[in-house]
Regions:
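A short glycine-rich beta-alpha junction/loop motif
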Residues: 100, 114-121, 153-179
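Short, solvent-exposed loop/turn positions at domain surfaces
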Residues: 1, 83-84, 154, 193
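Sequence-specific dsDNA recognition surfaces
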Residues: 38-49, 58-92
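A short beta-sheet element
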Residues: 86-88, 92-145, 161-162
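Short coil/turn segments at secondary-structure boundaries
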Residues: 30-33, 50-58, 151-152
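Alpha-helix initiation and N-capping motif
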Residues: 7, 14-15, 34, 53, ...
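Hydrophobic residues in beta-strands and at strand termini
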Residues: 62, 109-110, 125, 170-172
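Non-catalytic DNA-recognition/assembly elements of restriction-modification systems
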Residues: 2-48, 167, 171-179, 186-215
Length: 215
């Protein structure tokens, strides 16, 4: 329980650092230039049906993206999932954004290549003015959620389209500052990994003891 609390606190630390460095996006308290989506990123519609070529690549369905944190869990390969429909190609340069039920806030940062469900968009930040980690955190923020949820409330199955994402604008701080924030997030992620590993070790020990005494 304590370790789970530690993980939650580390997530809060990142959010607090975001506001500290970039201000409140809603009021744009630091007076950054407001920039349109297509000036700092693009939706990369590079799709494939070549399942032989990508057979051993990871296949990311939207169920593999944890809500809120964007952690990638429980995914399998393209071959294991028996993929039959067109999928988007992504790389470690992309953000994977689930366009279904945007209130679940599924924004992932893959560190590998693979294919993702057509229910998600691979988003490619413009490296000249936008850091990938910064953009992912901006997309997980209330600022982006408040914008995107106004469209999805109209349907039974809430879904976001390209046009709606393309209509998004946000304050864009200097790239050097975004990069500083990104370095901070990476350091926190390393700490999270350490906590996560100790959680998994504890779980294994618990199972072994249960087996020994009650198996």
């Amino acid at each position: 329980f304590l370790r789970k609390q530690q993980l939650a606190k580390l997530d809060e630390l990142v959010k607090a650092r975001f506001v500290e460095m970039f201000g409140d996006f809603k009021s744009n308290s630091k007076g950054w230039s407001i920039v349109k989506f297509d000036e700092f990123a693009q939706i990369d519609g590079n799709m494939t049906t070549d399942y032989k070529k990508y057979a051993d690549y990871p296949h990311i369905g939207i169920d593999s993206i944890e809500k809120g944190t964007g952690a990638l869990k429980g995914y399998r390969t393209v071959k294991e999932d028996g993929v039959v429909s067109g999928k988007y190609i992504f790389t470690p340069q992309h953000i994977i954004y689930s366009k279904i039920r945007p209130n679940l806030n599924k924004v992932a940062l893959p560190d590998f290549e693979g294919l993702c469900s057509a229910d998600a968009y691979p988003i490619l930040p413009n490296p000249k003015n936008c850091n990938r980690i910064f953009l992912a955190l901006a997309m997980r923020s209330d600022y982006f959620l408040d914008y995107i949820l106004q469209f999805s409330a109209r349907t039974n199955l809430p879904k976001v389209n390209r046009k709606e994402i393309a209509g998004f604008s946000m304050p864009l701080p200097p790239l050097s500052l975004q990069n500083d924030f990104s370095t901070f997030v990476e350091r926190v992620d390393q700490q999270k990994q350490t906590v996560q590993q100790s959680l998994e070790k504890l779980e294994l020990m618990k199972k072994a003891l249960m087996q020994e005494y009650f198996g």
